[in-house]
């Protein structure tokens, strides 16, 4: 996951930057995730890679801007695909089984999944980022992602963590 989600983007950017710098123009678009701006339980490696790509992209945006090169990030939320069942980190100790099952039940609940975006909806956001000419770093894609991110900004980090813990674990766990 680190090779694909982080090192792949870094290597691609390093490969194209000399050409873009010579032309004094270019645009990199990295697909991160709302999981690079906030987290949910039991997907820590995925979240770590997306947070790394978010931080790296933001830093590189400062560095490359002086050469007319932009970097933009797309942060999709839930997708109407089999992504969750394929990528969810379920390789845990059996002590976590009940909690993992509860979290998976919430994430894959049909009512919840109805709020997720189609690949075509995310493609529209990518197109917007590629063509709008704005010096904007982040494009949060999908109604669920926008709602979750707005909630995090409104509540602040600690209150948001407590709300997520309550949503997924109820009284079984309190955010430390």
Task: List PLM regions with ranges.
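A hydrophobic alpha-helix adjacent to the NAD(P)-binding/active-site core of NAD(P)-dependent oxidoreductases
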Residues: 1-2
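A short helix-coil junction within the Rossmann-fold of NAD(P)-dependent oxidoreductases
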Residues: 15-24
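Active-site-adjacent segment of SDR/Rossmann-fold oxidoreductases
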Residues: 19-20, 38, 59-70
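Active-site loop immediately N-terminal to the catalytic Tyr-X3-Lys motif
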Residues: 38-44
